[in-house]
């Protein structure tokens, strides 16, 4: 699944364990619930969520983002 994340908009990914988040264009800021460190992905970079936390994504500025499940569970996306 791929989508555009406009500057300043956010998306909540619920229970994101095993999800690969790839920034295809622009820059994406990621913050995981109760995780001390945030991450910033530039175009071409990706990260795999290693815990069952909720993750918030934000475009800095606009970004193109791809989500790929590494486990067999449905993705639940909330704007």
PLM features: residue spans?
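A generic structured-segment signal
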Residues: 1-3, 13-19
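Short acidic-glycine-tyrosine-enriched beta hairpin
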Residues: 2-5, 10, 35-52
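Histidine- and aromatic-rich ligand-binding microenvironments
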Residues: 4-5, 23, 60
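Short loop/turn motifs at secondary-structure junctions and domain boundaries
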Residues: 11-13, 30-31
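Glycine- and acidic-residue-biased ligand/ion/polar-headgroup-sensing regions
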Residues: 16-28
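A short beta-strand motif that forms part of the nucleic acid-binding face
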Residues: 17, 34, 61
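Short, glycine/acidic-enriched capping/hinge loops at junctions between secondary-structure elements
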Residues: 32-34, 69
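C-terminal structural segments of small proteins and small subunits
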Residues: 45-79
């Amino acid at each position: 699944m791929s989508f555009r994340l406009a500057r300043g908009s956010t998306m909540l990914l619920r229970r994101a364990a095993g999800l690969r988040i790839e920034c295809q264009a622009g820059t994406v800021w990621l913050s995981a619930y109760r995780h001390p460190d945030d991450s910033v992905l530039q175009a071409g970079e990706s990260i795999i969520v290693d815990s069952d936390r909720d993750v918030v994504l934000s475009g800095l500025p606009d970004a193109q983002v791809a989500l790929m499940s590494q486990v067999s569970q449905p993705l639940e996306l909330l704007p």
